[in-house]
């Protein structure tokens, strides 16, 4: 299949998924969670990945999620990442009143873009035209804040690194 036709099919599939994707982004924005505490977010992204037919692995680097799409054993293995955590930003619109967590860095949008890419490739069938494997990674605790929690997890032997991204790669 020609490249332009693949692109057209992917764009069409994403357009058809737009309402669900926008609802996902809005839901995550309204329920921000701090690093290594993204339990609800992790549940939501895993649920969406499963609805697309991805093989999902949970609890990576504590709250991380991986969805895998394999088109063939040959070819590259690439990753698409979307960060799960929020930052502390008291007073921001949709900040959690108890934790002050808010998606001021747009991680809810990153997650949605990750899901849009997956949906576009899967729903269009375009992934069947490609070689290789794609891992869609929901990355925990990317923002380097809330250090007390990270130090505690490290002391408990639950982390090797203070960064969720480094921890996810380590696993």
Walk through the language-model features, giving the residues of each:
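Acidic/His- and Gly-rich active-site-bordering loop/insert found
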Residues: 3-104, 108-135, 140-143
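Fold-level recognition of mixed alpha/beta catalytic cores in primary-metabolism enzymes, strongest
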Residues: 139-171
């Amino acid at each position: 299949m020609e490249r332009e036709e693949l692109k057209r099919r992917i764009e069409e599939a994403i357009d058809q998924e737009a309402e669900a994707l926008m609802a996902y982004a809005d839901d995550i924005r309204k329920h921000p969670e701090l690093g290594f505490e993204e339990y609800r977010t992790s549940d939501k992204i895993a649920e969406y990945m499963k609805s697309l037919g991805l093989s999902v692995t949970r609890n990576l680097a504590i709250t991380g999620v991986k969805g895998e799409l394999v088109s063939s054993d040959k070819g590259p293995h690439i990753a698409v990442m979307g960060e799960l955590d929020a930052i502390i930003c008291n007073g921001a619109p949709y900040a959690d009143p108890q934790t002050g967590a808010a998606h001021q860095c747009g991680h809810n949008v990153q997650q949605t873009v990750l899901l849009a890419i997956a949906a576009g490739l899967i729903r269009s069938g375009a992934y069947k035209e490609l070689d290789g494997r794609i891992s869609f990674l929901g990355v925990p605790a990317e923002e380097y804040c809330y250090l007390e929690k990270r130090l505690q997890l490290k002391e408990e032997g639950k982390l090797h690194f203070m960064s969720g991204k480094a921890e996810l790669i380590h696993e």
